[in-house]
Amino acid sequence: MTESEARSIITDYYLAESHSADDKFLFVEAQHFLIDAFHDPVDMHNLAWFYAEERNFGLYRKYLEMAAECGFLPAFESLGYFWYYGESGTVDYGKAFYCFGRGAESRDDYLRIGCEYKIADMYRYGYFVEKDEARYKEMIERLHDEISHPENLVTIMSSEFLPDPGLCYRLAEIRADEGRIPEAMKLLRKARTQFAQYLHDNPSWWGNIDEMESVVMMMHDLSLNWDGDIDLYDLFWLSVNKNTMSFRYNGVRFTVECLEEGRNIVIRFNNKWYRDLHSFFEKAKIGGRPITAIYEELTDYEVA
């Protein structure tokens, strides 16, 4: 394999909506070739995130730590999440705080903000540091103000790495607690639109599904008499009452059934079963295309 061939394989992988087992094998081989040949921490970090999407957290950690040893600050942000959420089975808030702190030293504003807003979460919940709700709110207000003026931010990263929707969701919680419901709903609509775009662009990343669920459920909690348009992601709310949703894609009607199985809700769609909604959003496809990638092409929603 040559460098040109390896980079071509990687580019094609990132541009594809879905990946076969062969695609994944070639991607890993290409990344290994580049890492062995050039020792670039960017390639190490990219391979780490491949393993995160595959939920292989042992190899995820291995390549993050390899990149961090090279001083690559984005790897510290990722390690912060690794320890914060205990993706290896062990939560370590001390290591998470250290890693987010290292990432926050970056002169790239997207990376700095991404780390600072997780540090804010740690002050909110008292993880490793003394709980400080006032400091949390001040940090979220400040960071949201920063991202509201993107022309002032210095970055080489793409927009998906700015935690804009996550900050909108947190500020919406603050506004809702203040009784400023219209402002909270406006922030939630923005967060929902952005998470939908993230899931369109990267259907493999399950973390955005978790965030989308929080946004949708809060929107419905704040609007007891829901008068907004229904779309695919309202399944999070509809599934609570075991509703059925249908929609059209290319003129054909499809149905998503939320069915009770013991204490759980399972999903039946297109003659396949999914253990829960998260599995559905991760794996469901129509004609080989991920359901989240064709979200904007779905029309004529009905609920029963």
Tell me what each language-model feature is:
Residues 12-13, 46-53, 80-85, 116-125, ...:
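Hydrophobic face of amphipathic alpha-helices that form TPR/SEL1-like repeat modules
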Residues 37-41, 70-73, 85-87, 106-112, ...:
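Short helix-capping/linker turns of helical repeat alpha-solenoids
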Residues 39, 71, 92, 111, ...:
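Structural signature of alpha-solenoid helical repeat junctions
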Residues 112-125, 152-167, 199-224:
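TPR/TPR-like alpha-solenoid helical repeat scaffolds
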